[in-house]
From Swiss-Prot:
Residues 504-526 have a biased composition (Low complexity). One of its GO terms (cellular component) is plasma membrane. This is Probable pleckstrin homology domain-containing family N member 1. The gene is Plekhn1. It comes from Mus musculus (Mouse). Residues 371-380, 391-402 have a biased composition (Polar residues). Phosphorylation is essential for its mitochondrial localization and regulates its interaction with C1QBP. Testis and adipose tissue (at protein level). Ubiquitous.
């Protein structure tokens, strides 16, 4: 047939129209050159891609340098963010923490540009707002920035210094917006362990400090404040039963929650104190847990690691809430461990102070004993100023009504007659309860031991009922005369009638075996109240708690004084309103008796205040 070379061929420049297989290599090269021209990394010599430079405004791309932009694209701040030109898409920066429209101005410059500023967990993202819409300005990492508010300026601005040719001023529209920006910037930079501004004080060595000591939050460097309380707790988001190990940090205006990760602390959330309140009264309350409640959150149960942490948290929360005027948690009376001035209502014959003495004047707070309040528990630690010790050397001194109580039995008595409402006072130092000293009372001690025992504070609790030994030598008949019998009893005057507390009368029986009985001289006779109608067999037991230094009573003491009630009682005048009785000097049966003037015996028994 012939050779193909003999067939006439079209010109070489026209062969492309007859080609069935286009060149793949040529297409790849043409596409690469076109994309490079669009993104500005390679400019053609003919410059026909100037119209395609609109792709420079796509956010998240790698913006070329200003040497590839001879034309003015209305981006005056484009050249200052070279440090922020990372190949990092915006979607990989995390969630937006805070954003708003601000104005940017370099220091010592008058050019101001509107800009949208977005704060990510570790970056600041700038977008310019112009005629073309939002355009990418730059991306600055927080690790290379320093934030500091401007002082003495009328503008609501803060200053950013870092990888910039000059400090950059960010102008906010209001003071509230400035506070929000400073708050979020300070918090994010604190979470990264950074120093916030040039004027911030040095942190110093943190080698032996817990990691949360670096956590700070503030509304500026001038008002910077640190964490008040921090501890490891377990958090339970009700109604879920799962508990998480967290680090709870209390700041002056918020509660921050962190988790301890291998790479450091991870921020979990923050609760403003103005939006939450602490609940200590829950049905399933543990001994060291409390609830955090709020209208916009699920109830959170906080379980402290120890009771000491629990008490410290409650104390710090009450202190911060009281200062800020927020919702106060319940007072210390709702939980043990914290003490506060309290008001107690007691019933019984008297109230005991912390040193074992009773007070009729009730000028200091007195805590009722377990017998006075059978349904309540007795506090383990109490403390308040002890009443002064009465002078025992002056026989004419008016008694202050303070006496030392001996162990008394727990038999029923008319305690419902007196109801006291004692107003509390500040508790300076708690006085620990010591029941071991109750057994150290020496009933047959001399005056030296008596004076020494007055200085030793004893427990306000009653000890076990005192049972006198059968071999006791001291009998009620050993006392010759009622005056010496009264001197053996450490009594106190009747309560001030102007006081709101009703009086409680106690019978003092008189034995018929004592001859020549005389009443105590002076105002004693004018301070005797009317006798009770019937004899109470508990009167002798009640005297055992009021004896200061007399010997132990025999077991048949009630039988000795029973005949005293057989006589017809005599009517005695009531006590005057403002006259205080003066008692004779207390004496012990084991010591010489002082001579007392004799007076005619008074028929019947006397009613004596104890």
């Amino acid at each position: 047939m012939g050779n193909s070379h003999c067939v006439p061929q079209a010109p070489r420049r026209l062969r492309a129209s007859f080609s069935r297989k286009p060149s793949l290599k040529g297409n790849r090269e043409d596409s690469a050159r076109k994309l490079a021209g669009l993104f500005g990394t390679e400019a053609r010599p003919d410059g026909d891609t100037a119209a395609n430079r609109i792709f420079h405004y796509i956010p998240g791309t790698d913006i070329p340098g200003p040497e590839h932009h001879p034309e003015n694209l209305e981006q005056p701040f484009l050249s200052v963010f070279k440090k922020g030109w990372r190949r990092t898409p915006v979607r990989n920066l995390g969630k937006v923490v805070h954003y708003s429209k601000v104005r940017l101005r370099f220091q010592h410059s008058q050019d101001i540009s509107d800009c949208y500023l977005e704060l990510f967990p570790s970056h600041l993202y700038f977008q310019a707002h112009g005629s073309e819409g939002l355009t990418f300005q730059g991306l600055l990492p927080l690790t290379e920035l320093n934030i500091c508010p401007t002082d003495g300026s009328r503008e609501h601005a803060f200053q950013i210094t870092g990888p910039l040719p000059a400090p950059l001023l960010v102008l906010c529209h209001s003071e509230a917006e400035l506070s929000h920006w400073l708050y979020h910037l300070e918090k994010q930079m604190a979470l990264l362990g950074l120093q916030r501004c040039h004027s911030a004080p040095p942190q110093g060595s943190l080698g032996d400090k817990p990691p949360w000591t670096q956590l700070r939050r503030a509304y500026g460097c001038g008002s910077m404040s640190g964490a008040i309380c921090a501890s490891r707790v377990k958090l339970q988001h009700l109604p879920s039963q799962e508990q998480w190990d967290r680090l709870l940090v209390l700041y002056p205006a918020s509660l921050a929650i962190f988790s301890e990760e291998p790479e450091g602390l991870s921020f979990k959330g923050e609760l403003p104190l103005s939006a939450i309140h602490i609940n200590l009264e829950e049905k399933e309350k543990e001994i060291r847990s409390f609830l955090i409640e709020g209208h916009l959150i699920n109830t959170i149960r906080v379980v402290c690691a120890s009771y000491e942490d629990y008490s410290q948290w409650l104390l710090c929360l009450r202190t911060v809430s009281r200062r800020d005027g927020a919702h106060l948690p319940p007072g210390p009376e709702s939980f043990p461990g914290l003490q506060k001035p309290t008001q107690l209502v007691g019933r019984g014959r008297g109230s005991l102070s912390s040193n074992g003495r009773s007070s009729w004047k009730l000028e200091c707070p007195v805590f009722p004993t377990s017998q006075s309040l059978p349904e309540s528990s007795v506090p383990t630690t109490i403390g308040f100023p002890a009443p002064p010790v009465p002078n025992q050397t002056d026989s004419n001194c008016v008694s202050t009504g303070q006496k030392k109580m001996k162990p008394s039995d727990s038999s029923p008595s008319p305690r419902g007659r007196a109801q006291r409402e004692v107003s509390g006072s500040t508790v300076p130092l708690p006085l620990p309860l010591d029941l071991t000293k109750m057994s150290a009372l020496n009933l047959d001690s001399g005056p030296e031991a008596q004076d020494h025992s007055l200085d030793i504070p004893h427990s306000p609790l009653y000890a076990d009922p005192y049972t006198p030994p059968a071999t006791s030598r001291h009998k009620i008949t050993d006392i010759q005369g009622l005056d010496e019998f009264l001197c053996a009893i450490q009594t106190s005057p009747g309560p001030d009638l102007s006081s709101p507390f009703p009086p409680v009368s106690v019978s003092v029986p008189v034995s018929e075996s004592s001859s020549g009985i005389s009443s105590s001289p002076g105002p004693l006779g004018s301070h005797l109240l009317t006798k009770k109608g019937a004899l109470q067999p508990r009167a002798s037991q009640r005297h055992r708690g009021s004896f200061k230094s007399r010997g132990p009573q025999p077991s048949d003491f009630p039988q000795l004084v029973t005949p005293a009630r057989e006589g017809k009682p005599s009517s005695l005048p009531p006590p005057p309103d403002e006259e205080a009785p003066i008692w004779n000097k207390t004496s012990s049966p084991s010591h010489p008796k002082w001579p007392q003037p004799r007076k005619p015996a008074v028929e019947g028994g006397f009613i004596q205040w104890i």
